[in-house]
């Protein structure tokens, strides 16, 4: 699943690759050898599997967990926050 909900807000499967999301949506999510998927990016930051409806801020991204089990993240709402000037 990868769909635009509104400007700068998306619904993404956590299994999508960071490289794919960056190419398709120009998101500029940092890439790393530590992870390849959006779920991996989130867990790399949180160090654990987040719970449903948990809100996570990573840099200028706001991520709300829509669906997760105790083993993996399934679906997230991904928003880009405008940088404050």
Each language-model region and where it sits:
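Cytosolic regulatory modules rich in charged/polar residues
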Residues: 1-85
């Amino acid at each position: 699943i990868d769909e635009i909900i509104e400007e700068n807000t998306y619904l993404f499967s956590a299994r999508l690759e960071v490289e794919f999301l960056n190419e398709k949506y120009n998101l500029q999510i940092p890439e790393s050898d530590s992870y390849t998927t959006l779920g991996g990016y989130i867990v790399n930051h949180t160090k654990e599997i987040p719970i449903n409806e948990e809100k996570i801020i990573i840099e200028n991204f706001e991520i709300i967990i829509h669906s997760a089990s105790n083993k993996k993240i399934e679906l997230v709402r991904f928003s880009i926050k405008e940088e404050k000037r």
